Amino acid sequence: FKNNKISYFCVDDNYVKESNFEGIPIIPYSELLNIKLRNDYKVFVALSYKNMNKVREAKYKQIKKLGFTFTSFIHKNSYISDKATIGENCFILENQTIQRNVIIKNNVFLWSGNHVGHNSIIDDNTYLSSHVVISGDCKIGKNCFFGVNSSVKDSITIKNEVLIGMGASVTKNITEGSVVIN
């Protein structure tokens, strides 16, 4: 968030236990409705992969409907090709390699140390845990989850809502709603 100042933390109303965190005010979600100058703020939805990323997706869509814009977090110690495209509300931790012509759509989380090969597309609301390898020319659907040390062979298509387990190797196209474990 190098060019952004954190103004508030916002949590669902029933989770507000304190008035601030690290000196930054915490506001209940219901107070977002009271913010008039919504273009003055950018939002980042920091929820994890629960329920195949659908909890984060739902909150992202709720806030988007309110008219807010979003920012992404990209760690300074990641390599991202200047020919890659990163969407909004993406969380990209350290030691990533994101090669040329990669498209990472909205609300995608990449934990530490992943490789996304040239010309690959990662669709909305997907989560890569650590040390995942997606080879070149792959197409990854919406709401997928990749376990630690999983890998995908070149030119593979993985449809929506697929769970790739820890250490799994994907060597063929995967249909929607599948689970892949080795």
Enumerate the language-model features and the residues they cover.
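Conserved acidic residues
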Residues: 7, 41-42, 142
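NAD(P)-binding Rossmann-fold cofactor-contacting core
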Residues: 3-20
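Short, conserved loop/helix-junction motifs that constitute active-site signature segments
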Residues: 1-3, 36
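Phosphate-bearing ligand-interacting subdomains
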Residues: 17-75, 79
